[in-house]
């Protein structure tokens, strides 16, 4: 059973130097498959380990696990300056995703502009297909988690979350946990109870991004341009930035884990909010 003591034993072993799954298996006296599943669980839950597979697809494939230093966020001056801005940003108005986008190789990025109402996902965005590409982990930066109420072509996004969670995809969310967002948060966390699984974890954090990262495949940011139409249903203009550069994806993941590990769980914060008289 993977408990905190065994997690520490594995992490301490890998911290010294990169290890193969076979070495880890011998160290903890488990078989290769069990060691591999333990490493995968630690990666999903804590983000402090990473894996590289050499000669993938061949009989001689070698899986190496190494320490992912989430403290060392930046690998260049651009990233260092950006992270300093992110650390002090509390709202989406405080930081533009374009400040990241501009540094990414033109062949590994794309952006498009669309007008939409808050809860309607367009075919061009195709959020459903994007989410379904997830094989292991979906990391989400959100504000009030309003997109759990969104719909794409009559298909509810909350149903896609359920689909992913049922496939044992790890879903980690950073969002503001307050009176305005509690219903959205509880709606998403309810899937854990419904499925009798704990694949969804939400933590409170005030941060500037509205984005999600699909495994190591791509990151998509959403930025509001605050342009409204005169129609009854409020329509805004948004810019979507998509990044597929491996180095920048890894950096954004490290930003996520740096914020996530120091943030309080949504469940605990909701309990504290509800402890205030007359709020329940």
Question: What label would you give each PLM region?
Answer:
Residues 1-6, 20, 51-78:
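Short, cationic-aromatic polyanion-contact patches
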Residues 26, 44:
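Alpha-helical residues within the helix-turn-helix
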Residues 30-41:
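Short amphipathic alpha-helical interaction segments
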Residues 83-173:
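PLD-like (HKD) phosphodiesterase/transphosphatidyltransferase domain
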Residues 200-248, 256:
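HKD (HxKxxxxD) catalytic microenvironment of the phospholipase D
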